[in-house]
C-alpha cells in the first residue's frame, strides 16, 4: 500500500470520527514514509504533536522543512535528544530525559495539545517499537490504552507507527 493511500485512509478515518490507528510501515522506507505522512496531514491543515522515540526531533524538523511542510501547528515530544546529546533548544519541542518515562509523555502531549490551533488534530508516535525497547509489554499495553482513551477525550486522533519487520504479535495486539 502506498503512503498516499495510507494518508488518504487516515484522513477518511479522522473525518469519520475515529480516534486511534496503528500504521505499520516497512523498515526500508520508514523514516521517509513518516515524513510524507505527517506532511500530508499538515497540508490538510491538521495540527499535531509528533512523539519521537527513534530519532532526534531536530532531524525530523529538518526533513519536514526540506519537504516544504508547514510546521506552524506542529509540536514535538522528543524522547531521544537528551539521551544521545542532541540539540535541545527548539521552542516547539518538549524534551523527556528517558524513554522509560511514559507518564511524562502523556503530560507533555497534554501541554502541547493546548497550543494547537487546528480544529482537527493528531498525535503521531514514531515509533511504538522504540518504546517497546524500554518498557515491559504489559506496561506498554497499559500506556497505549491510557493514551488512546486520553486522546479520544481530547478529540486528538492518535497514530501509532510501527516498523513492520520489527513488530511482534504481542506489540501488534496492543
Regions found by a protein language model. Give the residues of each.
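Conserved beta-strand segments of the P-loop GTPase G domain that flank and frequently precede/overlap
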Residues: 21-26, 50-52, 77-79, 96-97, ...
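Phosphate-binding/switch loop-helix module in NTP-utilizing enzymes
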Residues: 85-146
